[in-house]
């Protein structure tokens, strides 16, 4: 939060590190809970390119991985709350209910802190902020004053089992996400299922796979929300072989839709694209 970052900056100032001043710090983002009333509002949030929304809170560590979450305070069959970090100048749609949970300062996204010295300072700032909130698993073992921590590009390979070919094939076109707290990086898988984020992280990230594209989305038949597969929190690549079950079924529904929209269909007419994305229910 902004308050935690101000406190961390003040601690660093006490150690003689004063690249930023707590008194001058302003919110760069807001952490928001959206409360979509219907599927139209949910789809509007899903396709808003100014943010990345999730159907679960972002300010908690995920204790148990799973592909489903519904806020226990809401009745079954309703759309669960969704969460996102939006920039401080974000203009909200007054028709969609929302609640600002906290003001944020995300130093990794501060373009004024891009020099080598600034990066090392950001490492120390984040280290202090994590310690203050008890997130010791995210602290860095040792930080040198003018030497930033090494970064990495999240990536990996996604494959699905093809029963006709009797082998794994690449799952092309899915939205791969790598998230650290309130920051998300995206990449698309290629024909072979490979993906790599252009942006970097320095600590482990939460991976996830989302069955969505610009022109269509695969929704789950029971809850009608975008289908997704939750991944691990790690610093290494996330490689997945989807072999059986519902995830394999959804993957092949996505493959069929992807080919219908963008691949070779031997003269067939492409699907009609209305204003909204097409929804395929799996």
What residue spans do the PLM features occupy?
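A short, solvent-exposed loop/turn motif at the edges and junctions
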Residues: 208-228
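Short, ordered, surface-exposed loop/turn motifs in non-cytosolic proteins
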Residues: 12, 153-182
């Amino acid at each position: 939060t902004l308050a935690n970052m101000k406190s961390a900056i003040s601690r660093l100032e006490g150690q003689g590190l004063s690249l930023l001043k707590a008194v001058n710090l302003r919110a760069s983002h807001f952490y928001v809970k959206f409360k979509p009333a219907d599927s139209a509002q949910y789809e509007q949030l899903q396709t808003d390119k100014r943010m990345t929304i999730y159907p679960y809170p972002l300010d908690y560590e995920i204790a148990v991985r799973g592909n489903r979450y519904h806020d226990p305070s809401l009745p079954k069959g309703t759309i669960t709350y969704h969460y996102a970090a939006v920039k401080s100048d974000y203009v909200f749609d007054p028709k969609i209910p929302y609640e600002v949970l906290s003001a944020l300062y995300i130093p990794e996204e501060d373009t004024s802190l891009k020099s080598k010295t600034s990066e090392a300072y950001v490492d120390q700032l984040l280290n202090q902020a994590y310690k203050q909130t008890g997130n010791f698993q995210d602290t860095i073992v040792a930080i040198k004053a003018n030497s930033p921590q090494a970064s990495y590009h999240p990536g990996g390979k996604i494959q699905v089992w093809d029963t006709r070919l009797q082998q794994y094939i690449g799952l092309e076109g899915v939205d791969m996400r790598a998230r650290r707290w309130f920051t998300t990086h995206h990449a698309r898988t290629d024909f072979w299922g490979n993906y790599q984020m252009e942006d970097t992280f320095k600590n482990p990230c939460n991976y996830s796979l989302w069955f969505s594209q610009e022109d269509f989305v695969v929704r789950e038949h029971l809850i009608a929300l975008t289908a997704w597969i939750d991944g691990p929190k790690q610093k290494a690549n996330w490689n997945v072989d989807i072999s059986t079950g519902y995830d394999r079924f959804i993957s092949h529904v996505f493959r069929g839709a992807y080919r219908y929209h963008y691949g070779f269909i031997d003269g067939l007419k492409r699907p009609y694209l209305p204003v909204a994305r097409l929804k395929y229910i799996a």
